């Protein structure tokens, strides 16, 4: 969240709805309503939230819902598949998400490369995650740089989420 915004505070705290309802394994916490999640965030004193799987996907509906609980959208997770899919399609998906984030006044997108990821499969061992070749790394890095350019064009910051069970998890 912008340090020049309300109260001119340089640090503002938000929380992720995954602490109530898991995005990777949605049955974990599925009984929580979005209203309960946002109400409890507000009661705990948080000012923002990450986008979760129970949130409306229409910008005006999302803004209205967040305003009801005096919260702002701080960021959104976005899975990319640059190594597995056509770069052009993946970049189009990034731009669509970034455009949505701009519309709801969010400032950050959290990108994770999920090609071949095992993090959402409870039956897979983390050791079975994909290992990238040198050319895969070059493709991924180049694609992330292009995604960063898209984000910059919209005034959105790109943060990379190095999730366990994804191809970027290495011993190095």
Please annotate each region the language model reported.
Residues 28-30, 63-66, 123-126, 172:
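Short, glycine/charged-enriched secondary-structure capping and boundary segments
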Residues 19-33, 52, 80-91, 129-137:
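Active-site mouth loops of central-metabolism enzymes
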Residues 48-61, 80-92, 164-170:
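Acidic-and-aromatic substrate-binding clefts and catalytic sites of carbohydrate-active enzymes
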Residues 11-17, 49-51, 73-78, 107-111, ...:
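Hydrophobic faces of well-ordered beta-strands that scaffold small-molecule active sites
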Residues 3-26, 72-80, 117-127:
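N-terminal small/glycine-rich loop or linker at the start of catalytic domains
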Residues 34, 39-41, 49-51:
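Active-site-flanking structural segment that lines cofactor/substrate pockets
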Residues 3-10, 38-43, 56-75, 92-107, ...:
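Acidic (Asp/Glu)-rich catalytic clusters
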Residues 88-172:
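Active-site acidic/histidine proton-transfer and metal-coordination neighborhood
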């Amino acid at each position: 969240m912008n340090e020049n915004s309300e109260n001119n505070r340089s640090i503002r705290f938000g929380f992720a709805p995954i602490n109530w309802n898991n995005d990777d394994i949605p049955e974990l916490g599925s009984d929580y309503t979005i209203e309960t999640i946002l109400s409890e965030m507000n009661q705990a004193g948080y000012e923002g939230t990450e986008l979760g799987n129970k949130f409306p996907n229409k910008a005006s509906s999302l803004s209205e819902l967040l305003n009801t609980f005096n919260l702002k959208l701080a960021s959104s997770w976005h899975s990319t598949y640059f190594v597995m899919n056509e770069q052009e399609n993946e970049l189009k998906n990034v731009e669509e998400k970034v455009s949505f984030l701009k519309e709801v006044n969010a400032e950050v997108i959290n990108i994770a490369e999920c090609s071949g990821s095992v993090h959402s499969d409870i039956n897979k061992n983390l050791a079975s995650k994909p290992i990238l070749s040198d050319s895969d790394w070059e493709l991924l890095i180049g694609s992330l740089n292009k995604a960063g350019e898209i984000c910059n064009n919209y005034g959105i910051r790109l943060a990379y989420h190095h999730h366990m069970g994804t191809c970027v998890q290495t011993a190095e």
